[in-house]
Swiss-Prot record:
Efficient DNA binding requires dimerization with another bHLH protein. Forms a heterodimer with Daughterless. GO terms for molecular function: DNA-binding transcription factor activity; E-box binding; protein heterodimerization activity. Developmental protein involved in neurogenesis. Required for the formation of chordotonal organs and photoreceptors. Seems to bind to E boxes. Specifically required for the photoreceptor R8 selection. One of its GO terms (biological process) is post-transcriptional regulation of gene expression. Coiled coil: none annotated. It comes from the Eukaryota. InterPro entries: bHLH_dom, bHLH_transcription_factors, HLH_DNA-bd_sf. Residues 136-174, 220-248 are annotated as: Disordered. Proneural clusters and sense organ precursors of the chordotonal organs, optic furrow of the eye-antennal disk and developing brain lobe. Residues 162-174 have a biased composition (Low complexity). This is Protein atonal. The gene is ato. It comes from Drosophila melanogaster.
Length: 312
């Protein structure tokens, strides 16, 4: 990009425009001449050097005036991280301003490392209690217990899927009730099975996403030969019908898309409800501002660790 293209986006002040008015070659005032400076020719060793901008200084660097702001090359201060006093560092509030390196960071990744390092010191937070917070299909926030045997093979039919979820959740609930009584009565009596809190997992064969198994691909042209016939019969889940040449109609695709959208909407609503329930138990800062999700989790971690220190 030449420097004349740069200065097309370089906003001039009114003083610069007046300077262009007197130095312009035209008899009339052309305001666009401020954004397309004329070509000046320099002589160097008998060769004519055409510089497309008279803002290119002798040392080759582009020199800017102080009076005007370039909105293109350097970012404005408003686009940097907000310096508003609404951001409260919860670590310095609760830990009395410790000088640890991890405590002074404002970002989430360093926070998580420091929380992980302090978490094993709390004896009351037992890992089997966390198992209630995830169904058997979600692999994000589930801790695998040490006593669990080999995992049963997952089948994509409706028959035996809810039974595994129903058997795993009461055992986890029984283990969590045996742990230290840290939670309120409302939390312990919460019905995790029937509250539709974790039904975002893909259990139904009809509600799978657009590409489910081998049924979306036409196996005859050879472009999507993902498996041979025996494997595709086995992938049909014992339903007895071959899926190879089956085309999905746009109506079915639209139904699946709508079902996936409804699942995602329900998941986000449940997540927001869980955050609202968590904000009820956390101490508020008193500045009439609802904590963001990141600040809520940060406050919850600090609050739980402070309660653990208090119990110890």
């Amino acid at each position: 990009m030449s420097s004349s293209e740069i200065y097309r986006y370089y906003y001039k002040t009114s003083e610069d425009l007046q300077g262009f008015k007197t130095a312009a070659a035209e008899p009339y005032f052309n305001p666009m001449a401020a954004y397309n400076p004329g070509v000046t020719h320099y002589q160097f060793n008998g060769n004519t050097l055409a510089s497309s901008s008279n803002y290119l200084s002798a040392n080759g660097f582009i020199s800017f005036e102080q009076a005007s702001s370039d909105g293109w090359i350097s970012s404005s201060p408003a686009s940097h991280r907000s310096e508003s006093p609404e951001y409260v560092d919860l670590n310095t509030m609760y830990n009395g301003g410790c000088n640890n390196m991890a405590q002074n960071q404002q970002y989430g990744m360093i926070m998580e490392q420091s929380v992980v390092s302090t978490a094993p010191a709390i004896p009351v937070a037992s890992p089997p209690a966390v198992e209630v917070m995830g169904s058997s299909n979600v692999g994000t926030c589930k801790t695998i217990p040490a006593s669990a045997g080999p995992k049963p093979k997952r089948s994509y039919t409706k028959k035996n899927q809810p039974s595994t979820t129903a058997t795993s959740t009461p055992t986890a609930a029984a283990e969590s009730s045996a742990s230290v009584n840290l939670y309120t009565e409302e939390f312990q009596n919460f019905d995790f099975d029937n509250s539709a809190l974790f039904d975002d997992s893909v259990e139904d064969d009809e509600d799978l996403m657009l590409f489910s198994g081998g049924e979306d691909f036409d196996g005859n042209d050879g472009s999507f030969d993902l498996a041979d016939g025996e494997n595709q019969d086995a992938a049909a889940g014992g339903s007895g019908k071959k899926r190879r040449g089956k085309q999905i109609t746009p109506v079915v695709k639209r139904k699946r898309r709508l079902a996936a959208n409804a699942r995602e909407r329900r998941r986000m609503q449940n997540l927001n409800q869980a955050f609202d329930r968590l904000r009820q138990y956390l101490p508020c800062l008193g500045n009439d501002r609802q904590l963001s999700k990141h600040e809520t989790l940060q406050m919850a971690q600090t609050y739980i660790s402070a309660l653990g220190d208090l119990l110890r």
